[in-house]
Structure formats: C-alpha cells, structure tokens
Amino acid sequence: MKDFLTYLSTAPVITAIWLGITAGILIEFNRFFPDLLFHPL
C-alpha cells in the first residue's frame, strides 16, 4: 500500500489525474452551455 501511495504521489500521475478532471469539467460545462466556452470578446 505504501508503494501504491508513493506511485500516486509522482508528478506524471498527479498531472494525468488533474488534466482528466479539468477536461471533464470543461466537457460538462460545454455540454450545458455550448456557446459560452468560446465567447467572442
């Protein structure tokens, strides 16, 4: 279990999880508000 926690605390794993969460939030936001993500300024 200690080795598994050490593996989870490495930078590539944290980066992959963070990018997956961010992508999921953006996908869900774009699904409910399709015109707001790329709004012209």
UniProtKB/Swiss-Prot annotation:
It is found in: Cellular thylakoid membrane. The keyword Zinc does not apply. Pfam families: PSI_PsaJ. GO terms for cellular component: photosystem I; plasma membrane-derived thylakoid membrane. The chain crosses the membrane at residues 7-27. Keywords: Membrane, Photosynthesis, Photosystem I, Thylakoid, Transmembrane, Transmembrane helix. It is a single-pass membrane protein. May help in the organization of the PsaE and PsaF subunits. PANTHER family: PHOTOSYSTEM I REACTION CENTER SUBUNIT IX (PTHR36082:SF2), PTHR36082. Belongs to the PsaJ family. This is Photosystem I reaction center subunit IX. It comes from Cyanothece sp. (strain PCC 7425 / ATCC 29141). The lineage of its organism: Bacteria, Bacillati, Cyanobacteriota, Cyanophyceae, Gomontiellales.
